[in-house]
Amino acid sequence: MDLSTAGILLLDGVTNGAVYGLLALATVLVFAVTRVIFIPQGEFVAYGALTLALLQLGRVPGTVWLLVALAAIAAMLDVADAVRRGLRPAQLLRGLLRTLLLPALVAAVTAWAAPQKFPLLVQSALALAIVTLLGPLVYRLAYQRLADASVLVLLIVSVGVHFALTGLGLVFFGAEGFRNPPFWDARFVAGPLMLSGQTVIIFAAATALIVGLYVFFERTLRGKALRATAVNRLGARLMGISTSSAGKLSFGLAAFMGALSGLLIGPTTTIFYDSGFLIGLKGFVAAIFGGLASYPAAALGALLVGVLESFSSYYASAFKEVIVFTLIIPVLLWRSFQHGHDDEEE
């Protein structure tokens, strides 16, 4: 391997690592706030890329009807809860509007806009809106009533949600794969390296999102409420913070980050209905570096996963997935040795 080849592999690895970093941050966020090991994170990646692909073809994506169906079911559950708690009609109406209005509006706009074949950025915004709104609804229907259950129970629910979303993905998108057009098709030469415009977009989007998350958590009331819920759910509840609202918000952010990741990698690789699982698992491996608690460690782990995957594909392409996922073993052993005595004392 010469220096130019190593540089190309390193650039490719860092590019993939930037995407895995977004998924790792989403995984850490969801686990910190809700204690859910969110296996279906990768499905949001596939849904984002494939929803955009169908919009590119001028078709209404099936995720729109999934959004409407989940919103309707959530509204029925809200009505049942309101009746059981004896809420006034005005309170019930406000709750129904919060649940139904935005999904219905996004669905209507998408149904109208899909045949029009608007520019790529408009279609991308629609795809982001559709998939992002799925996140809070998934939490409301699958996890909210089990918020105080054990981590194992929540993990089992995550496995079920993963299989459900994967099966629905096959129904909505079919078995064929799609590759989306790049957001920027420019080319830049930096010595022996050829830098594509899409790579620049990936770095810029990942950096902007990380900075945005930092500002959100440090400067906004909702962000501080999420941090408080992550530190101590009971204490946050005693201070008047709604843990269910925090859970919905964390799932919404995770869905947004997953959908954005799908839009970013859609032009660089062919995405199938089940591609999100492996992509999400690589984000999970990166999150393990931070013990599902540290955002900086998860981001660094994502870069390591991306670089290792890139060099593995060069030296042993048939075993690159095995090599990447084997990385989790020494990390788990290290964390076990580091914290084992503390766990025994507890």
Predicted regions located by residue number:
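Single transmembrane alpha-helix segments in multi-pass membrane proteins
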Residues: 6-57, 75-85, 137-153, 289-295
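Inter-helical junctions in multi-pass inner-membrane proteins, predominant
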Residues: 2-13, 19, 199, 216-221, ...
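Short, non-helical or kinked segments that cap or interrupt transmembrane helices
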Residues: 27-49, 62, 86-100, 148-153, ...
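Pore- or pathway-lining transmembrane helices of multi-pass membrane proteins that form conduits
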Residues: 42-47, 94-104, 127-128, 146-170, ...
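Cytosolic-side transmembrane-helix boundaries in multi-pass membrane proteins
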Residues: 5, 71-109, 172, 234-238, ...
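Alpha-helical transmembrane segments within multi-pass membrane transporters and channels
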Residues: 62-156, 161, 300-305, 336
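Helix-loop-helix "hairpin" substructures at the membrane interface of multi-pass membrane proteins
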Residues: 194-272, 295-300
